[in-house]
Curated annotation (Swiss-Prot):
Has high binding affinity for fatty acids and retinoids. GO terms for molecular function: retinol binding. This is DVA-1 polyprotein. Belongs to the NPA family. The keyword 4Fe-4S does not apply. Keywords: Allergen, Cleavage on pair of basic residues, Glycoprotein, Lipid-binding, Repeat, Retinol-binding, Signal. Gene3D superfamilies: Nematode polyprotein allergen ABA-1 (1.10.533.30). Nematode polyprotein allergens (NPAs) are synthesized as large polypeptides that are subsequently proteolytically cleaved to active polypeptide units. It comes from the Eukaryota. Glycans are attached at N997. InterPro entries: ABA-1_nematode, Aerolysin-like_pore-former, ARM-type_fold, DVA-1_sf. Residues 22-60 form a propeptide.
Length: 1557
């Protein structure tokens, strides 16, 4: 059995049988609704057909044309519909009896009679309908008759199911072959090629699936006994059961079953149960070592072919010498020929062994005679094993017909010692004279090449007379054929003869090559030397003769790129040295060639590798490699697969050649591969992983594209030069690049191992060590070198990440701080900081930084404050932990003061147990308190009147004492204008050093001091934050105007540049300038009024109304200078918003297509994206929405799911943009509260109706309409696919009993995608719920069960469950019925989800029922102490033992047995105690209320019989069947105890049976 034959299972699509539904069974309502019969037509198609309604033939042809354009899956569904629709007219004109006869003809598959009979009813139609039937007759005939072939119908139905794992291209290829009428074997061969290119794990998974399909089919044709055997036996034994089932069939069914049996034969044996394999190996191969047994087990586990497994067994067997080897061979031989006992007598078998010692050919003939006596199924099995068995039995015996036994062994041992080639062909040389043989031996012993020996043989042969030559040729021809007969089955022999007769030499050579692998090593050695002679004698053209191609031909074909001098050099090496030296020289010449020659050399040598590789590995294996490459396998994965294939070669010479060739070709391919990658990958790399570079940097890298080392170094240089957000982006992209390239080099499997380490939380060092180990295992030197280069860069990148996100205990590096938090320092200050850092005095370091911060002024101060605050957030959070960091953020968001936050930080630091870490945290906290204190003061000063003392101390140190005194006098008069003028007067009069010192401060300080507390925002700030979109020339112009002091001209120039901007620059400018407007206007009107403006915007108020409100607020400003500035800014901003509005209108409300394609339309293919861009450019937004919806409707499977997620996200984004954050939050709350989609939709409409801007409202309505459709489709998609219900829904409706912490745990597990783990966690939390919360949890989870189970099994099945519940069925019975419904689901994914839900729900329902049952359980220990004290110790022990064995029903019988054995006082004591027990337990079962009623009856004096009857009636009202059964059982015992006679009990039981009925 060959593992590759598993692919034959994809052909099961031709043969799986399912229930056949008659075409005369009209159960589809659409058959009678005209509007539904052609709903597949598009509106455009319907319109076109409408124009042809008066031209019936053209209408029919056009309809069929449209119909044939449908997707295959959709067309298949409609085909079934139209098959019945074609004959639905019969329902109106034929009686039930007549339709019954048509069904009989259909079941008999009598096509001609069926069609004749159908159309015999046509005359009963009116004339119009007759014409319709006639018009469509040809088409309908095809539909009606093609359904009659069950095999064809079923194969079409299941074809997709069995080839789902193929790529679309492969599926199409299979369908094309099927359509073209290709044979079973041809399709099988193609499918096997695809299958073998899959990973081993994927192959194993598919084999398991196909095996289940096989079993399912055979259980349909098996009887009940056989079905049980199929369920319980191992796969190998099932095959024998199957054969009996198939043998009973007849006709077409049998023909089909035989094909199924052939296809499934390997599957039902491909992987026997592990225990069976272990047992077989231990029993039949006991001579093996444990290690060898493990190897064989692994071969079974991997699904390797029986041929491979036998070859490995033979290899192990060949390695055993001495008595152990003899015993092992004897054991194998016994197992091999055990079957003979079934068909031959002991005498015949003994005679066979004698014959074996003298005549091998006669022995083989006799064995085949015995095989002929076997049943057909056993015969096939034995023939498959025969080559292997004969290999064992005959390997130590030579040809007894030609020489003595001992001589043979002598030769064999010589061969083992030094591989004598002459010995290998000696049976072909028995015509030589002794002296000629001696001459050949001399040549061989001299060490000459064996070709010299062959040349001498040819010379001797040439000396023979012609008659002798003819005689020898006939003999040789027979000898050439003998080895084939020895290893081939009879079926294979027939195939070989047919191939030979038809001159199908290509397939014949492949078959012979396969058979050679069954030979012993000595036999292969022989074939190797006589192959060409034999093929010549049999007139077979050796299609593999290429490997004998002369060096000259090879030079022309593959080495034409060499110079004449190089060619002469390699020729000389070829003739004088070994092949490895020859190959090395070729590589050396290639690598030293110029680029153009090297490219040609690579191309030629790759062709040589394909050519010779096919010769060595075989066409089939090369196809596997080709398919792997086509499917995107990495170079390393392909390389590893080639190594595996070579390892499987058993011929040592061929294997050696293969290794040599592989080594050479890997180098050639790696050179070509790397060159291709350089050309293809570099632009790809720039687009994916180096977007953080600017254009000049990218261009510089392009000039180095042929030098990886330089590129890596330059990237690191650029990377080291980045800071802030650019640095973070660079880290993120380069990490992705590292993951991608390392994976491409080491392969999928190793990459998964590395990923696993990361997920397990291993350190960067451990992960790096693992990567190094994996790279070191790469055999190809060039690939390993490339991997090492990439690793160096990646270590560097991940090192930076480690510094950015390192463990809390590590000291953050100065380099990181300089890049992110200390950029405001001057170069001199940085040098000071570095020197302190180098001596490792952290305390002094913090103090010095704070000193520099205190000395900073103006913009430097602002920048320092911002960066140091960021540093505080980063480092303190790093030291106190993520959770505490989040808590501080919440405090800040809730309005806590800095003091309160600082106090909380100190508490957290005190809780740190690590002394070193706590000290670091304390240092950082102390500095940060100062930073936040200074920042707060600085901000306060910034927003209030700056005092003169501060100014004199910090900014006017250049004044003399007299000037300072004058300023103080003016300051006290509160004449700020006079104060400003005086400062400028002093400044203008300054000279020399004083003037220089003043000038340094004038830009950042003096000017600020002059202005009011809402400082005039300087140009540098604007250029950094709001004018980054300007080019250098524009910025220069801005600076010139700014220096002139003309602010009006400055605003105009900004607007001029903005108006002139286009495309992305315009978009960026709009964003930045609007941000500037918000910032400056807020600065002028104050926070409170700015907040009101923000609320207006979010409420959808128009831009015009907002503008008016801003004007009102500005009018309220009392400071005229400030008001003038505010008006100037407002005027400019109105223009900016006007332009932005126009721009937004032109570009679809700022939501441009590029944004949408990147965020919400990634599921579109390139062609669809192109269509979208074309429509977008036309400006037709309505068409754009329609096109998106059209694509969405047409999407299927995973694409549909992804589209639903993205489009819903887009809806949330855009609708929020139209209705504002506040209203969007309300919508979100409604959704989380479980409000229906319809209600949410209404609320959105209400909010849109409140928008006053008509244009904005129109856009919002358009978006809303599209979103309703999207949510509708998504809802359908969920409903159609019984979606995996989302967690938000569950949390809101069914899991509200959980604490926040528990919900967080469940969300975290849910986020991993592991639904089973999610269910398990919910059940774990449910089991641990306190008793007071249990009822709520149980109620919610039961509601969830009803909801989800309904979703899975459907309304109809749910109605059945509901009916069972209402009729009093137990939870167990209901659970079993739900399991039946779930088992009937076809969708495997849906079934798995349903099974998970059902399993959890059984536990949930079990809680209440279990509690109920436990309430009614009799406590045996309590019963013994209260009601069974009359038992002796031995009897009590027996009762307890029954309890421990859980034989509770037997306990009652045993007690009554003991009761019957008592007498006298013991009997009375027992009766009294048991009566008390009866009262107690009956009360327990029927309840307090019913027990009270029974007591009243008893007190009224009714008879025991009447009382018993009443108890029986009461028991029968118990709803729970299990409890009712227990109560009945107790009552039956109590009747005996109370002395009710059997006859009386019978009367009472009549009533009991009435209730049962």
């Amino acid at each position: 059995m060959k593992s590759t034959s598993f692919i034959t299972l994809l052909l099961l699509s031709y043969f799986i049988v399912e229930a056949h539904s008659s075409i005369f069974h009209w159960d589809d309502e659409r058959l009678f609704k005209h509007d539904d019969t052609h709903s597949w037509l598009t509106d455009v198609q319907k319109a076109e057909l409408e124009t042809l309604k008066h031209q019936p033939i053209q209408l029919r042809d056009k309809t069929l044309e449209f119909y044939n354009q449908l997707p295959t899956n959709e067309k298949a569904i409609w085909d079934k519909f139209y098959t019945k629709y074609c004959v639905v007219w019969l329902k109106e004109v034929a009686s039930d009896e007549e339709i019954g006869k048509l069904k009989e003809l259909e079941s008999e598959k009598n096509k001609e009679a069926l069609l004749t009979s159908i159309y015999s009813f046509k005359d009963r139609l009116d004339e119009v309908d007759q014409r319709k039937v006639e018009l469509w007759k040809e088409t309908c005939d095809e539909y009606v008759t093609k359904g009659l072939s069950r095999k064809r119908r079923d194969s079409n139905k299941n074809f997709e199911e069995f080839i789902y794992w193929m790529t679309d291209e492969q599926k199409q290829s299979m369908n094309d072959m099927k359509t073209a009428g290709k044979s079973f074997n041809e399709i099988h061969k193609e499918g096997r090629k695809y299958f073998k290119a899959l990973t081993i794990d994927k192959q194993s998974s598919l084999k398991e699936q196909f095996k289940d399909k096989c079993k399912k089919y055979f259980m349909q044709i098996a009887n009940s006994d056989e079905v049980e055997k199929i369920k319980s036996l191992n796969d190998d034994e099932i095959r024998h059961v199957v054969k009996n089932a198939v043998a009973r069939l007849n006709g077409e069914d049998k023909e089909f079953a035989v094909k199924m049996e052939t296809l499934c034969e390997d599957v039902l044996a491909f992987k026997a149960r592990k225990n069976d394999i272990d047992d077989k190996i231990n029993r039949r191969l006991s001579w093996m070592t444990d290690e060898q047994k493990q190897v064989v087990k692994q071969l079974y586990a991997d699904g390797r072919s029986q041929a491979d497994i036998r070859a490995k067994i033979f290899e192990f067997l060949s390695s055993i010498d001495g008595p152990a080897g003899v015993a092992a061979k004897a054991q194998i031989q016994k197992e091999c020929y055990k079957w003979m006992e079934e068909v031959a007598t002991a005498e015949e078998i003994a005679a066979l062994h004698e014959l074996h010692e003298i005549d091998h050919d006669g022995c083989r003939r006799k064995v085949r005679e015995f095989i002929g006596r076997l049943p057909e199924d056993r015969k096939l099995e034995v023939e498959k094993d025969l080559p292997f068995c004969e290999k064992i039995w005959y390997r130590d015996h030579g040809d007894h017909n030609s020489h003595k036994h001992g001589a043979h062994h002598h030769h064999r041992h010589l061969a083992v010692r030094r591989r004598r080639h002459l010995y290998a062909i000696e049976k072909f040389l028995d015509w030589l004279k002794p002296e000629q043989k001696h001459e050949l031996e001399k040549i061989e012993n001299s060490g000459a090449h064996f070709d010299d020996v062959i040349a001498e043989v040819k010379k001797f042969y040439g000396l023979l007379p012609e008659e002798k030559k003819i005689e020898l040729k006939a003999k040789f021809k027979s000898q050439c054929y003998d080895w084939v007969k020895e290893v081939a089955t009879s079926e294979e022999m027939n195939d070989i003869m047919k191939m030979h007769e038809s001159k199908n030499h290509s397939d014949l050579m492949k078959r012979l090559t396969e058979l050679e692998n069954r030979l012993t090593e000595d036999q292969k050695h022989t074939i190797e030397h006589v192959r060409e002679v034999c093929l010549g004698l049999w007139e077979v053209q050796n299609t593999n003769k290429q490997h004998k191609q002369s060096l000259e031909e090879a030079m022309d074909a593959y080495l034409s790129w060499m110079t004449d001098e190089d060619k002469e050099k390699v020729k000389a090496i070829y003739e004088t040295s070994n092949r490895q030296t020859f190959y090395d020289e070729i590589l050396k010449i290639m690598e030293s060639s110029e680029d153009e020659v090297k490219a040609k050399a690579t191309e030629k040598l790759e062709a040589a590798c394909k050519h010779y590789g096919t010769n060595i590995l075989g066409e089939e294996n090369v196809d596997i490699i080709r398919e792997m490459k086509k499917n995107g396998a990495t170079f390393e994965e392909i390389s590893n697969r080639v190594d595996e294939l070579i390892e499987g070669i058993t011929d040592s010479d061929r294997k050696e050649k293969a290794y040599r060739m592989s080594k050479l070709c890997k180098k050639i391919y790696s050179l070509g591969h790397s060159k291709q990658l350089q050309q293809y990958d570099f632009e790809n790399v720039l687009q994916k992983y180096l977007t953080w570079l600017d254009d000049s940097q990218k261009n510089e890298l392009r000039t180095m594209s042929d030098n990886k080392e330089k590129i890596y170094k330059k990237i690191i240089d650029y990377f080291d030069g980045t800071i802030g957000e650019v640095k973070e982006k660079a880290v993120e992209e380069l990490q992705l690049a590292c993951n991608h390239y390392i994976k491409s080099i080491v392969g999928e499997e190793k990459a998964m191992e590395i990923k696993q380490l990361k997920e397990e939380g291993k350190s960067s060092e451990e992960i790096a060590k693992k990567v190094e180990d994996v790279i070191n295992q790469i055999s190809d030197e060039s690939i390993r070198s490339r991997a090492d280069e990439a690793l160096l860069v990646c270590k560097r990148i991940f090192g930076i990440v480690k510094r950015l996100r390192r463990d809390n205990s590590e000291i953050h590096s100065l380099e990181e701080a300089m890049e992110r938090y200390l950029t405001w320092l001057s170069d001199d200050q940085k040098i000071v900081i570095k020197s302190i850092y180098d001596v490792n005095d952290r305390k002094v370091l913090y103090e010095k930084i704070m000193e520099f911060f205190d000395d900073a002024i103006g913009e430097t101060k602002q920048k320092a404050a911002k960066e140091l605050k960021d540093a505080c957030k980063h480092y303190v959070k790093d030291l106190i932990g993520e959770e505490n960091g989040n808590l501080l953020r919440e405090m800040k968001e809730n309005g806590a003061s800095n003091e309160a936050i600082a106090t909380k930080v100190e508490e957290m630091i005190e809780a740190i147990t690590d002394e070193t870490k706590r000290a670091q945290a304390m240092r950082a906290s102390t500095s940060c308190r100062k930073v936040y204190g200074v920042v707060q003061r600085f901000r306060r000063d910034h927003h209030h009147e700056h005092n003169l003392d501060e100014a004199l101390e910090k900014h006017f140190t250049w004044l003399n004492e007299e000037q300072k005194s004058q300023l103080k006098t003016i300051y006290e008069s509160e004449d700020r204008e006079a104060l400003h003028k005086k400062v400028w007067e002093f400044f203008e009069a300054g000279a020399g050093l004083r003037a220089s010192n003043a000038s340094k401060k004038i830009y950042g300080v003096a000017k600020r001091f002059r202005r009011d507390h809402h400082h005039e925002h300087n140009l540098d700030e604007a250029l950094e934050k709001y004018l980054t979109w300007l080019n250098e020339e524009q910025k220069s112009q801005m600076k010139t105007i700014y220096e002139s002091g003309d602010r009006e001209a400055l605003y105009k120039k900004v607007l001029e540049f903005f108006e002139a901007a286009t495309g992305e620059v315009k978009e960026k400018a709009a964003v930045e300038l609007k941000s500037a407007c918000r910032h400056y206007i807020k600065d002028y009107i104050g926070d409170e009024k700015a907040e009101k403006i923000k609320e207006m915007k979010e409420s959808g108020v128009s831009t015009e109304e907002i503008s008016k409100k801003v004007d009102e607020f500005i009018a309220m400003i009392t400071d005229d200078e400030k008001k003038a500035k505010a008006l100037r800014a407002s005027s400019a901003c109105k223009k900016i918003y006007g332009v932005a509005k126009r721009f937004r209108r032109d570009h679809h409300h700022e939501h441009n297509l590029e944004e949408a394609l990147e965020k919400y339309l990634t599921w579109l293919n390139e062609e669809q994206k192109s269509q979208m861009k074309t429509i977008y450019e036309s400006g037709d937004r309505e068409a754009l929405y329609k096109k998106v919806l059209e694509f969405f409707e047409a999407a299927t499977g995973e694409v549909k799911e992804k589209a639903a997620v993205e489009l819903k996200s887009a809806c949330r984004h855009y609708i929020k943009d139209y209705i504002g954050d506040e209203k969007a939050e309300k919508i979100k709350e409604m959704k989380e509260s479980g409000v229906s989609t319809e209600e949410i939709s209404k609320k959105v409409d209400e909010f849109i109706a409140m928008i006053t801007d008509d244009e904005k409202k129109a856009k919002a309505l358009r978006a809303s309409n599209a979103c309703k459709k999207i949510y509708g489709v998504a809802k359908r998609l969920r409903r159609d696919h019984h979606h995996e219900h989302n967690l938000e829904e569950a949390m809101g409706k069914y899991l509200s009993w959980m604490s926040d912490e528990q919900q967080a745990q469940v969300k975290k597990i849910y986020g991993t995608g592991d639904r089973l783990a999610t269910y398990n966690k919910v059940m774990e939390l449910f089991e641990s719920v306190p008793s007071d919360e249990k009822e709520k949890a149980t109620s919610q989870l039961k509601a969830a069960c009803r909801h989800y189970i309904k979703d899975f099994i459907g309304k109809d099945n749910l109605a059945v469950i509901k009916e069972m519940k209402e009729s009093g069925a137990t939870n167990e019975a209901i659970g079993e019925k739900i399991d039946e419904f779930i088992a009937g689901l076809d969708d495997e994914q849906k079934k798995a989800q349903a099974q998970r839900a059902a399993s959890a729900c059984k536990k949930i329902y079990g809680v209440k029922s279990r509690k109920r049952r436990e309430h009614y359980e009799i406590d045996v220990d309590e019963a013994i102490s209260k009601y069974l004290t009359w038992l002796n110790e031995e009897q009590k022990a027996e009762i307890k033992q029954l309890k421990e064995k859980d034989e509770k029903q037997t306990i009652g019988k045993k007690i009554m047995e003991f009761f019957e054995l008592t007498s006298g006082d013991d009997k009375e004591k027992a009766r009294e105690q048991l009566k008390a027990a009866c009262k107690h337990y009956v009360k327990m079962y029927v309840g307090e209320e019913k027990a009270a009623e029974l007591k009243k009856l008893k007190d009224s004096g009714i008879s025991l019989e009447e009382m018993s009857k009443k108890v029986t009636e009461t028991i029968e009202t118990i709803e729970d069947e299990a409890v009712r059964a227990k109560a009945r059982r107790i009552h039956s015992y109590c009747q005996r105890i109370f002395g009710i006679t059997k006859a009386r009990r019978h009367l009472a039981m009549k009533h009991h049976r009435f209730y049962d009925d």
